[in-house]
Amino acid sequence: MSQEQVVTELLRPIVESMGFIWWGLEYHYNSMNSILRIYVDTQEGGIGIDDIVTITEQLNPILDVEQPITTNYTLEVSSPGLDRILFTLAQCEQFIGATVHCRLRFPFEGKRKFQGIMTAVDHDKETISLTLADGAAEVHLPFTQIDKARIVPQF
């Protein structure tokens, strides 16, 4: 089990018991200053600074006692934001019709970066479909190969 999975299993039930939505987490390891960033949201969308402080105050002692991460790190609790990262296929499904930027772990059809309108999510094949920005082609990206999928806000 990865470090991210261990932390998720430890903290997700706490965040959800407080009435918040666990959106996901990122762990950026660095020998000088690692960051554990936890994204939370509300049913209504948007989370306030008071909520972030409350969640942080609940999670810090648990992390101190359980120590799922043994190196020094900074805990950040954050809103997913308008340009939110999509961590799961279920999250992707909520944003069908949105513009998404995907960076893959390995090249797919000769490219690692794709941007387009998300048109479908296939849970059986574990893929997301994008109509590319030029509108000329549709690609079906294997979700397990996506390093990061992020919403591109339209203003």
Swiss-Prot record:
Positions in coiled-coil regions: none
SUPFAM superfamilies: YhbC-like, C-terminal domain, YhbC-like, N-terminal domain
Location in or out of the cell: Cytoplasm
Source superkingdom: Bacteria
Record-linked InterPro entries: Ribosome_maturation_RimP (IPR003728), RimP_C (IPR028998), RimP_C_sf (IPR036847), RimP_N (IPR028989), RimP_N_sf (IPR035956)
Keyword Lyase: no
Residue ranges crossing the lipid bilayer per the database entry: none
GO BP annotation list: ribosomal small subunit assembly; translation
Keyword Zinc recorded: no
Keywords: Cytoplasm, Ribosome biogenesis
Pfam families: DUF150_C (PF17384), RimP_N (PF02576)
Role summary: Required for maturation of 30S ribosomal subunits.
Family (UniProt): Belongs to the RimP family.
Annotated protein name in UniProt: Ribosome maturation factor RimP
Organism: Dichelobacter nodosus (strain VCS1703A)
Name of the gene encoding the protein in the UniProt record: rimP
